[in-house]
Amino acid sequence: MKFGESLQLALIPEFAEQYVDYNGIKRKIQLVAALPEDERKKLLRRNSDGSWPKGSIDEMLENDLQKVVNLFNTRIVQLDNYVTRLSTEKSPNTEITQALSSSYEAEEKAKQLKELDFRLQQLSSFCEWNKLAFEKLAANMDKHLGTERLVTFYEQKVCKLDFANSSKIYESMIALKALNSSQNDSEVKDKLEKLSIHHPLKKDLLAFIQLDIAAEVVTACINAPDSVLVDILAASIIAGAKACMREVIGRIGLRSECLASALRRAINNLCGPDEGVLYFLEVLKQICSVVYVDSYHSNRLLSRILLVERNSKGQSVMHSVAKLGWAGLCSKFCEIVSSIPDSEPLNWMLPCWRDVMHDTPLTLAIKGNHVEALHALLSAQDKETTSTKPGPVPPLVLTCCVGDYDLIVEELILAGFNPNEVDASSNTALHTAVRYNRPECVKMLLKLGANPSARDFLNSWTPLMLASATGLSEIVSILVASGASVDEVDSSGWTAMEQAVVRGYLHLADKLRTQVALSDKPVNLHTLYIKASSSEMRSRKRAMDLQLSRSVVIIRISDLAGRIRVSLQGDDAVYVSGRSPSFAASRPSSVDFMSQSTDSLSKNDTTASNGSMTPSSSQNNSVIIDIPRSHFDNAGEVCLENLAEPDEIADDSIHLHYDAAQENSPQPVNGSSPPYELVFVTRNTEEATITIDLLANRSHKILGRTVCCLTSLVSDLGNHMQSLKPLAPLPLLSSKTLKPIAHVNADVLISKVTVDDRFSSNDGISTPALSLEAVSNVSRTALEDAERSLHKSATTTSESGKSNGVAVIGHRGLGKNQPDRLSLQLGENTLQSFIKAADLGASYVELDVQMTKDMVPVVYHDFIVNETGTDAQVHSLTLEQFLGASHSPSEEIKDDASDIQQKRRPRAYSSSFTPSGSQVNFGEFAEENARLKPKVYKGNALGHTICAPFTTLKDVLKEVPQSVGLNVEFKYPMLSEAEEEKLLPIAYDYNFYVDTILSIIKKYGGKRKYIFSSFNPDICILLSLKSTNPVLFLTEGGTAYRTDVRAASLRQALKFASQWSFLGIVSACEPLIMCPRLIKAVKQLGLSCYTYGVLNNDVDNVRRQVRFGVDAVIVDNVLAIRRALNQYDESLESD
């Protein structure tokens, strides 16, 4: 993902308008770079008075820098004052506090400390993102405009400002840490005092207050400090004791700060009727009428008590009643304030109403879903003030963020708020309601005038497009029913239906189908978010080249947020960076993908004649990633008890700001994202260990750690078998207490070095082992070009839309067997089927390969063989048993199976095997088994097809003509497939499975063309690492549920294929028939596009795909489809 997109995700709503306009300035740089040299130089020079030209890039940078500095200075002062208030606030009297159950005060203070900690993290995030944005913009100017802004602007100006270093934020954090320690000490003291047995004064005083015996309360007030008097007054308000109130107010006097503090405390502890507060106001008015001659001073006192006096959080009495939802008190207080002569009309959106957390009484009522309290506040507000700019987050947008509060939405709109008002990111309330899956809010907004065609800033998406991209079926139905247009396109030219289909939400296609003819010209890929980052692609290409000399280790991290350091300790272990070689000479930055130590590694590594690498002392085996923890990124873990000091020295780990893994397009509620994938190489995987550290923010202090052996993350079951189930999460232990503080899911894929070189069917292509230096500067372009040219005839579609370049591939040979076919079919995945498909003009034939219990690759589609009369997985049957399940095994195959069986040593003299001549024909049980189980049609079935014996991969390679290419599908179940088909969750070890099949192909394959494919993403990765033949990733494109995110949708499949530089994808044809323009998106990524599925047997569907550029179709009726395409070409030529 690009930095500008990550920055949009990291925006903190409160500060949204104060961020650097990164995208705007970057576009300006591109425009200036396209100008003639004279005009460009003019815009980059200062005027005679020292100012920058109006509208120039430098002027924009200066203005944005000033915005950032102003906000930082304002906020840091506010937060420092907040800390000071909390530290100087007097503690209440212990006994009276206990009498009022004022453990609430301690809890409230603890909440304030947490909120302050959170605000400091937000400010830290704001500073880091803007600093990074300035650095990238300066580097961009230097790159495209030939300036030196990285030095003159960034280093000499930005880096010297307070916001760009951590000193002031650290000072606040250290003060907060000290305050938190004192709070903990006071809590311990309170607990000890609560152990005392007798509190006669407390019990008597409470009884006297409840009975409103003022004389006894007067005695307790003699010589009492203000804090005690405030507590007694608060207790009197709660009890509704008028006489006690008079006496205590007489002692306190008409001091607004004490009276407001007592009233706030009483309101916060109210648990029943609010008559006591009304009695307090009545008593106060009576006293004021005696003390003051006119009503001016009494009104002013009430105004100060209710509105002006604030606590340490900057909240007044009005904030308290709105937060707790006391609607009656809200009405009463608003009535009192409005009745004061010469008072200004109430406007809850004015900055003066904001507390330290930028909350107003209005926003507090919204967050608490207090409809009646909100109604009271809005009734007292001047109707004209609703047009006033409400701040960074409009109330309607805020409502849709915090909950599905349709009644709150109704109150706000009826009070005059604009339903189409936008926030700083140009999102309306309707966009926000869709993003957070608030169907009731969506209904109410549409009912009260929200515009369903409003567009956001980032992608120019309407609410319908956003709902489609997140798969929210209910909201899509609501929007379509309200008249939202399904024909509109976003900034890249894609419709809502295409956004839904590419993300795997095919069930929405019927609701979003457009009747408008869309252009078949290439469109922008931006809003589809299917591109892999260049750094990901580079790191994986380098891993492919290093595979010959080292094992590649892919570590995946999930379910852990914050600043994470992942290290691999082992023999010559190195993190494979995706850093561009062009940056090798440039200065390192805080987000470079490789530190300088990696450069020295490249320089010091030498390549021996056998392709091995000499280890260097500067090798880097760790990487730091910033995993987003909320709507703002890189906030890191700032734990008060583990606060890092500002002068800690950073280590030499590579720092990787992991924008590439963060999904920018909105995720559905409870949706999943791909894990964070890191690539390492090492020589010895058996002795390697993985260390995962949770680091403090802005330092390398370790807050938690987990360590494990690399091999322990592979669920090895012995005998080359492994489990499909994920391992249990690893506990992350605190560095101080050694107690678990979090859990992390870690998954590992290891591509082990094999004795033989990587398999290639092309003699002209060789790949010697490369050093890391060579890998960093030499790409696999030549190798890829050779691969693509080798298969060009099968994967190139002509510009005219003709099908003469479209490969027709026989599905499982001549085609998948169908029960409804009227003509007799050859059995699928049989030798006869493969040979016949070649005779009928198939460019390639597709076959499915699995392995038996005795490790022989065989050709069979289903994971379960039930021709035996029982369900048996292929890997649980020996070759003899597998071939015996065939309806008509050939004599040659019988002999092969017998030879294998006879070579096997019996486990005991009493054991024996069934001779070949008397082996059991399992086919006799098939008919009985079919009656007992649900009707699942099996290919190559007796009575439905020209039944042929099962076959091995070796026989296919020997018998099928060399002129016919083979599309070999490696059948390996994913966990979701195993659960669907009720398989045991075990399978062969990844490496053993792939190596065994590749060795057979290498030994017997000859010089034919090969394409490898698999539905399992990890198998595809190993094929790309272990073989130079083209690899295709098979995806169901959303037509079936898959737990692996990479296999769940067309979008994820395209990103995955791009990352690992596969030849292309083989997609289920349904999504591409629904949205054929997505074929062009696949081609724009440089990937080949193959399709499979029953719908490919319809000629019209195939022609539709051919028109948009599909490279190959896998079909069941090879002859009919080939003839139809030839006729299609002839009709085009005649036209």
Curated annotation (Swiss-Prot):
A GO MF term: phosphoric diester hydrolase activity
Enzyme Commission number: 3.1.4.2
Required cofactor names: a divalent metal cation
Location of this chain's protein in the cell: Cytoplasm
Main location: cytoplasm
Catalytic activity: sn-glycerol 3-phosphocholine + H2O = sn-glycerol 3-phosphate + choline + H(+)
PROSITE patterns tied to this protein: ANK_REP_REGION, ANK_REPEAT, GP_PDE, SPX
Top-level EC class as recorded in UniProt: hydrolase
Name under which the protein is recorded: Glycerophosphocholine phosphodiesterase gde1
UniProt gene name: gde1
